[in-house]
Design a protein with these regions (language model features):
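Core alpha/beta nucleotide-donor-binding catalytic domains of modification enzymes
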Residues: 1-20, 24-181
Length: 181
């Protein structure tokens, strides 16, 4: 909560689109925002993206997300995309195609819903990984920066915590999550 306030990520009246895959990181983010929404006074729309890669597992993730949102009385949208096809079409890796598709889907949801923020579940470990990827690619000093906590309408409230803290948080709340096999 202090990190969110420090970076002025959320304010009363915001409409926050939350990327919710069902994995530990996004479930943690969703629960934290759900706890803060009444305290601060903002709305949440969860958006789940099925990448068309993992078949039945992906359908199970989608059901998990829908059930979680119903329990918390948070509206949820689920969008399916054929990422392998998109990757071939645009000559990019599936990872890059997935990132591009998610960004477009989140931004479209925000536009249609009147969203003011898009919350993503990147954490400290992701930030370190990004830094070293940039370093390995030979980025100059300017390109060495990691992930920004606030970038336009995008916010990343978990950048101040690591993966272990996220898992501990979920364990402490006896909250399950999906594991990407």
């Amino acid at each position: 909560e202090n990190y969110i306030r420090q970076w002025k990520m959320l304010e009363k009246g915001d409409k926050v689109v939350v990327g919710l895959s069902g994995g530990a990181d996004s479930v943690c983010l969703f629960l934290i925002l759900e706890e803060l929404r009444k305290k601060i006074g903002f709305e949440i729309l969860a958006v789940h993206v099925n990448h068309g890669i993992r078949g039945e597992e992906a359908k199970a993730d989608e059901e998990f997300v829908k059930t979680l949102c119903e329990k918390k009385e948070i509206p949820c949208r689920s969008v399916s995309v054929d990422i392998p096809k998109m990757a071939v079409e645009y000559r990019m890796s599936e990872e890059e195609a997935g990132r591009t598709a998610r960004r477009e889907i989140f931004e479209q949801a925000a536009e249609e819903w009147g969203g003011t923020r898009i919350a993503l579940a990147h954490h400290q470990d992701d930030n370190a990984e990004t830094f070293f990827l940039h370093l390995a690619r030979g980025s100059g000093l300017r390109g060495l920066g990691g992930i920004y906590p606030v970038n336009g309408m995008y916010i990343r409230p978990l950048l101040c915590v690591g993966r272990k803290e996220i898992e501990d948080y979920l364990k402490g709340r006896e909250m399950s999550y999906c594991i990407d096999a």
